[in-house]
C-alpha cells in the first residue's frame, strides 16, 4: 500500500505540494481547512516611498500581486522574502528584485536590517 498524505493547506498550496509528493510516490488527499482571501478594498498607500516590502508567505505574495495589478505594475520594487518558497512565488508573479532570507522570520529581520 502506498503512503497517503492528508494536505490541509489552502487548495493552491496543497495542489503544488501534491505534485511534489506524487513525484516521490506519495498519494495525497487534498482537504483544505482554511481559505486565504485578500481583504476587499485593501490599498498600499505610499508604496513609491518604501525601500522594500517584507513578505512572509506565498499567500502574501499573491495578495500583493493582486493589489498591484498585472505586471509590470510595481514589479521593480525590492521584496525580501522569508524563504525560498515565498521568493519563488514572487518571481512567478513577475517581481524582479527578490531576495530570500533563508526560512524564518528572525533571518528575514536580520536581512532587512542589513539591507535597509
PLM region descriptions:
Residues 1-116:
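Signature of uroporphyrinogen-III synthase
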Amino acid at each position: 500500500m502506498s503512503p497517503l498524505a492528508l494536505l490541509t493547506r489552502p487548495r493552491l498550496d496543497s495542489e503544488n505540494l501534491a505534485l511534489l509528493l506524487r513525484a516521490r510516490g506519495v498519494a495525497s488527499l487534498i482537504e483544505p481547512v482554511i481559505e486565504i482571501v485578500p481583504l476587499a478594498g485593501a490599498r498600499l498607500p505610499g508604496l513609491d516611498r518604501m525601500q522594500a516590502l517584507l513578505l512572509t508567505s506565498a499567500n502574501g505574495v499573491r495578495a500583493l500581486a493582486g493589489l498591484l495589478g498585472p505586471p509590470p505594475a510595481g514589479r521593480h520594487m525590492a521584496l525580501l522574502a522569508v524563504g525560498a518558497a515565498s521568493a519563488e512565488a514572487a518571481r512567478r508573479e513577475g517581481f524582479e528584485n527578490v531576495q530570500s532570507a533563508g526560512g524564518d522570520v528572525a533571518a528575514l529581520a536580520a536581512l532587512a536590517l542589513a539591507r535597509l
